[in-house]
């Protein structure tokens, strides 16, 4: 059994082959291929693509499944593809991001329980300690609302900024910064672009998966690492709401929460750059 990886860049024209059958009945999702049911899952390449590949190569066949992975490097695409029926499920996002997508786009998408967490980190080519960030420094930050709030919370915990009283960190944006003692200048960019802009800024807050794809290790290379305890940003399997009770989808989610997957995550990312959430 082989996982098929279909890389899709943000600027590419999407020609997604839809193999998911929209419908709410049991076993309605996926494409039957002999004794196996093929599920097409959209995911970011690292670590979700790696985790799905492990499941496909080691666990899926015994559960009657064949997993085909469609890789995305643009966060705006997997939920649209799922909503449009081009894929059967996706695995790339956290709950605050899904909530913002549902509210903004009207998607009817349901999340399962978190599988893994990729801590955010602050990276710099020149600065070795967060305390050494100079006045008027330029710091790269996500431009999507849910991840921007996450980055601001991490910077607040490091006492680089202070958010206004009563602001929920999940919803925080740059205009919610009340105190900025070093007069840090924020440079907004798409999550996938932040690692590429490190030469142009003093430091940058980068998503764990994007950092790994760029050859950066959050736990080892970051000058500031997000706290993992009570973190609401775990990534999960998501499906169209009408398919949340589908038996094949539930089988896949069970595999993703299996002891084998937990051990795989702990062994492959023993440095803590990716953590199991179960």
Where do the language-model regions lie?
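Secretory targeting and sorting signals
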Residues: 1-22
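Bacterial lipoprotein signal-peptidase II cleavage site
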Residues: 16-36
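Short, polar/charged alpha-helical segment
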Residues: 38, 45-68
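Short helix-initiation/N-cap motifs at beta->coil->alpha
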Residues: 69-80, 168-196
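Ligand-binding "clamshell"
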Residues: 100-112, 127, 200, 205, ...
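A conserved helix-loop-strand patch within extracytoplasmic ligand-binding domains
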Residues: 112-161, 262
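A bilobed periplasmic-binding-protein/Venus flytrap-type ligand-binding module shared by bacterial periplasmic
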Residues: 119-130, 233-246
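Periplasmic-binding protein-like
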Residues: 147-156, 256-276
């Amino acid at each position: 059994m082989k996982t098929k990886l279909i890389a899709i860049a943000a600027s590419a024209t999407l020609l997604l082959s839809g193999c998911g059958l929209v419908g709410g009945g049991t076993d309605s999702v996926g494409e039957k291929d002999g004794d196996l049911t093929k599920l097409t899952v959209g995911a970011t390449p690292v670590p979700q693509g790696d985790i799905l590949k492990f499941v496909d190569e080691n666990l899926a066949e015994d559960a009657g499944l064949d997993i085909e992975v469609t890789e995305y490097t643009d966060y705006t695409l997997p939920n649209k593809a799922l909503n449009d029926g081009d894929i059967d499920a996706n695995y790339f996002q956290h709950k605050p991001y899904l909530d913002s997508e549902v509210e903004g786009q009207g998607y009817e998408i349901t999340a399962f329980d978190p599988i893994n967490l990729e801590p955010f980190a602050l990276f710099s080519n020149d600065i070795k300690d967060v305390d050494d960030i100079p006045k008027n420094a330029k710091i790269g930050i996500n431009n999507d609302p849910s991840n921007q709030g996450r980055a601001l919370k991490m910077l607040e915990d490091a006492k680089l900024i202070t958010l206004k009283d009563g602001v929920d960190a999940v919803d925080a944006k740059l205009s919610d910064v009340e105190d900025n003692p070093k007069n840090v200048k924020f440079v907004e960019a798409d999550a996938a672009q932040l690692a590429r802009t490190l030469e142009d800024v003093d430091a940058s807050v980068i998503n764990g998966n994007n950092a790994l794809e760029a050859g950066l290790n959050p736990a080892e290379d970051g000058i500031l690492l997000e706290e993992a305890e009570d973190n609401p940003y775990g990534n999960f399997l998501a499906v169209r709401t009408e398919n949340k009770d589908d038996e094949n989808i539930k089988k896949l989610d069970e595999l993703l929460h299996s002891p084998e997957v937990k051990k795989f995550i702990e062994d492959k990312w023993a440095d803590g750059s990716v953590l199991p959430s179960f």
